[in-house]
Amino acid sequence: EPLRVALDIEIRDNSMCLDFSRTARSCAGPVNISRSTTIACCYVALKHIFKEVPANSGVLSPIEFVIPEDSLLSASAPRPVGGYTETILRIIDVIFVALSQVDPLISNGCAYGTINALSLAGHRRDGRRWVMFSFFGGGHGGHPEGDGLNHGNAPISTATIPPLEILEAAYPVLFTKW
């Protein structure tokens, strides 16, 4: 049975309420996340929509978060949380969709819906071990002014995809096609 991530959003004068009350209860599988991770995802989604949002804790003060205890988005021990990347993208998606219903001009469509990660490991010529882990992009939803990105980073952070030249300089890898 699918696990529901549902958001009701209320915009007030200078504040908003993000209410996840209709979200599924925590589950036996590893896709649960903590309350703090949920709040961090909300910040990241809002930062993607409102570029001028500063990167400080004060930015969260006008936001009320309603996240039920022991839900998918506020799991308690011993519920597993190791597969959280899929769930955090759902939070970002529902915020994008909710805000696009408030004003279609402020939010783009959802991104590609999962995490594209590459993990490689090996030994250097001198015998030292190396491990490379990097996120790579995918397609993003469109917006009123045009199509979305065809190869953007997952909106799970405000980071960017590392330049391939940096990865090639740091690890014994060579990218021949991108």
Where are these regions (language model features)?
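Glycine/proline-enriched, intrinsically flexible loops and inter-domain linkers
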Residues: 1-178
